[in-house]
Amino acid sequence: MPKKSSVAIVGSGNISTDLLYKLLRSEWLEPRWMIGIDPESEGLARARKLGLETSAEGVDWLLAQSEKPDLVFEATSAYVHRDAAPRYEEAGIRAIDLTPAAVGPGVVPPANLRDHLDAPNVNMVTCGGQATIPIVHAVSRVVDVPYAEIVASVSSASAGPGTRANIDEFTKTTSAGVQNIGGAQRGKAIIVLNPAEPPMIMRDTIFCAIPEGADHDAITQSIKDVVAEVQTYVPGYRLLNEPQFDEPSVVNGGNHLVTTFVEVEGAGDYLPPYAGNLDIMTAAATKVGEEIAKKSAEASLASGAQA
């Protein structure tokens, strides 16, 4: 078995703690450190109990250590990561960014998982992006998509202070991802924090404008194939019904449309199952980290064989 890549988690909130449990199961990644700024954080306490080295002194502490991680997963906030990103790169640490900072290229596994495995910093877009961009990609690889709009509805109970502070970045980063990763010519993103009790699981609606005469069967099959791919790392990701095709009308702006409805139920590793919006972020980040670690291990084996 190849040597695992060592990992530091920067941030000690809900997303970081859920991520920790996923990383502990990984065959390719070894979480060694968790870094925060609150000494009383439940995340740091859990990490210590699980054998990680922890600190509440932030990134300064991590970068001052003689041994540094191969990978950093950062789940803080956009402005914090923008400050830290150049410091990670200078230290030779690859960064997987779970904030909307978008310092590095965005990665959504079904769309472009292998395109940026050598980048020093990759961005996981947003929870809404991870849930909806695969569908836009599924449609755009069959037909041109002049416009795509996504509506992500998540439980208010799953939106902590970090999520709420990042709402503006969420809409900008997700809209850009719908275009740059999903393949739509124009994109728009809307997030809804639903206060319903008991909390509802994440539900997303994806509208894609398509050409007249588009092959509905091919689009439907492409969507189902992508859903199956996402389910390999997020088992609770599913279609709510068959993709719906609509003729042009005043309501839809005169476009031929395909509308897809998905829901995301979390695995319940640390966060409750209704927090599928957070679970899909940590699961996708783990998937990307494992692919980076695999490529690094393959490169090491190849160089060793040549020597």
Swiss-Prot record:
Enzyme Commission number(s) from the entry: 1.2.1.10
Protein name in the entry:
Acetaldehyde dehydrogenase 2
Q: Which SUPFAM superfamilies match?
A: Glyceraldehyde-3-phosphate dehydrogenase-like, C-terminal domain, NAD(P)-binding Rossmann-fold domains
Write down the InterPro entries for this protein, in alphabetical order: Acetaldehyde_dehydrogenase, Acetylaldehyde_DH_C, NAD(P)-bd_dom_sf, Semialdehyde_DH_NAD-bd
Q: Give the positions the UniProt entry annotates as the active site.
A: 127
Residues engaged in binding NAD(+): 12-15, 158-166, 277
Disulfide bond positions: none
Instruction: Return the NCBIfam families for the record.
Output: ac_ald_DH_ac (TIGR03215), PRK08300.1 (NF006157)
Gene3D superfamilies recorded for this chain? Dihydrodipicolinate Reductase, domain 2 (3.30.360.10), NAD(P)-binding Rossmann-like Domain (3.40.50.720)
An annotated GO BP: catabolic process
Organism per entry: Mycolicibacterium smegmatis (strain ATCC 700084 / mc(2)155)
Keywords assigned by UniProt?
Aromatic hydrocarbons catabolism, NAD, Oxidoreductase
Decide whether keyword Oxidoreductase is in the record.
yes
Q: Which reaction does it catalyse?
A: acetaldehyde + NAD(+) + CoA = acetyl-CoA + NADH + H(+)
Q: Which gene encodes it?
A: mhpF
Pfam families in the cross-refs = AcetDehyd-dimer
Alphabetized HAMAP family for the sequence: Ac_ald_DH_ac (MF_01657)
Q: Offer an example of a GO molecular function term for this protein.
A: NAD binding
